[in-house]
Amino acid sequence: MKVLVIGGGIGGLSTTLALRRHGFDVDVVERDPAWGVYGVGIIQPGNALRALDSLGLAEACVESGAAIRGDRTWLADGETQIAAHDWPPLVPHLPPGNGLTRPKLHEILTSSTLASGADVRTGVTFSEIAPSDDHVDVAFTDEERRRYDLVVGADGLYSKVREHLFGPDLKPRYTGQVCWRYNLPRLEGLEEIWMFFGPDGSAGFVPLGQDLMYILTIETPIPEWRATIERDGAAAVYRRRLEPFAGPVAEVRDQITDDDAVVLRPIENIIVPAPWHRGRIVLVGDAAHGATPHCGQGAAQAIEDGIVLAEELARDVPVTEALDAFTARRYERCRAIVEGSEMVGKWEQDHSLPIDPDATRNAVIMTASAPI
């Protein structure tokens, strides 16, 4: 079987590696000529490490990152602790969780993909997809044309493959919050995710390496405020947003000085109705189910998608039957995670809502920890 994967990010490369491990012939196209990655760091919870372990990549991630043992929560004063959880490991020889820079994860995935024998072309994407009952003809922006048995849309939250399949009206929805991120030297004693909750949002730290962490802030902006800022002065804006926080957040606030290193994004999500395929074209990862960051499951679910899709295709059944089985295994799990993560964000915006954020997070964790 010959497969085209559109998108060279976490979901696309995980899918490629899983397919190659089952012996499928895979082409990858990535529209970014530099095949780079944007962002700061990423949380790999236990189920992400479990999935990466099945691809032979978990130990490389752990060696390049920082173990996460659990989470700790305080009020904005930095002194009043309100929660502490130690995470159990899902894989005996791996830590409960891991923090890693996005560039390092990208390096691990790209080098493994190239070593797998997949045909990777960068600076290229599709210009036309013409499906039929037994194949898909694809025209590319470099004027090549190729024929495939299956096309996988792994092109992220703003997926063009999704738009091709389902139309322009099915798109990510802004959930009312924004997220700031910035890399900093790691605080002494940071072995867990530390979060601090204030009246209008939260700030926290995630370990990424022996000497590195990132600070993140999830907040509800004023209605007329947009989740975009000018590069000049971005660090000063972020520092001002952190002024309500005392304790460790206040201690590191003045270290935020590099405008270009500030990452600010609107928090959006999407869940594409089942099934996630039309004929021989299927969506994976954020293209199908982009979650908000409140439960740290976005990348984990994308990796799981690739593993499950490869397993179903390896059963040697008709392609559409395998794709139906893929959606059947993935839809309810991903829906629960997307909706649960959004509920936590809703509670952060309005504490009067009848939502128990701890119970909601626990439900998401239980869903994600279950076998795939």
Which residue ranges define each predicted feature?
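Conserved N-terminal helical subregion
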Residues: 1-3, 45-166, 170-183, 222-225, ...
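Flavin-binding catalytic cores
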Residues: 228-263
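Short helix-loop capping/hinge motifs at secondary-structure junctions, enriched
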Residues: 185-191, 224, 248, 315-316
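C-terminal auxiliary extensions adjacent to catalytic cores
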Residues: 362-372
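Conserved mid-domain beta->alpha element of the FAD-binding
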Residues: 6-21, 25, 29, 152-153, ...
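Conserved Rossmann-like nucleotide-cofactor binding loop
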Residues: 11, 34, 158
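Conserved N-terminal glycine-rich FAD pyrophosphate-binding loop of Rossmann-like flavoproteins
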Residues: 33-51
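Active-site substrate-recognition segment that forms the wall
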Residues: 182, 192-225, 235, 242-245, ...
